[in-house]
Amino acid sequence: MGKESGWDSGRAAVAAVVGGVVAVGTVLVALSAMGFTSVGIAASSIAAKMMSTAAIANGGGVAAGSLVAILQSVGAAGLSVTSKVIGGFAGTALGAWLGSPPSS
């Protein structure tokens, strides 16, 4: 599939790169917007509501390894290299798929 078919194969490559960068770059922004910040959970945020719900459901504490605990950890410390690589691959695959030519 080259220019003769009306499709620029570079478009899929650009979409793949953009997808990978966006996938990794938006994680911390999204978590911060939810209230999982580098200094802890922000008051009156979605994160605070999630933590309250998890604590009530668990008898007063948030269980280690729960979704809230994991998101709090990522919000405070950032993503590990492995998580960035996995997220980058997922974003790259999605970007390549979205940038590919439509099926005939």
From Swiss-Prot:
Disulfide bonds: none annotated. It holds the Pfam family Ifi-6-16. It is a multi-pass membrane protein. One of its GO terms (biological process) is apoptotic process. It comes from the Eukaryota. Keywords: Apoptosis, Membrane, Transmembrane, Transmembrane helix. The chain crosses the membrane at residues 14-34, 59-79, 81-101. It is found in: Membrane. GO terms for molecular function: molecular adaptor activity. InterPro entries: IFI6/IFI27-like (IPR009311), IFI6/IFI27-like_sf (IPR038213). Induction: Not up-regulated by type-I interferon. One of its GO terms (cellular component) is mitochondrial membrane. Plays a role in the apoptotic process and has a pro-apoptotic activity. Belongs to the IFI6/IFI27 family. This is Interferon alpha-inducible protein 27-like protein 1. The lineage of its organism: Eukaryota, Metazoa, Chordata, Craniata, Vertebrata. The gene is IFI27L1.
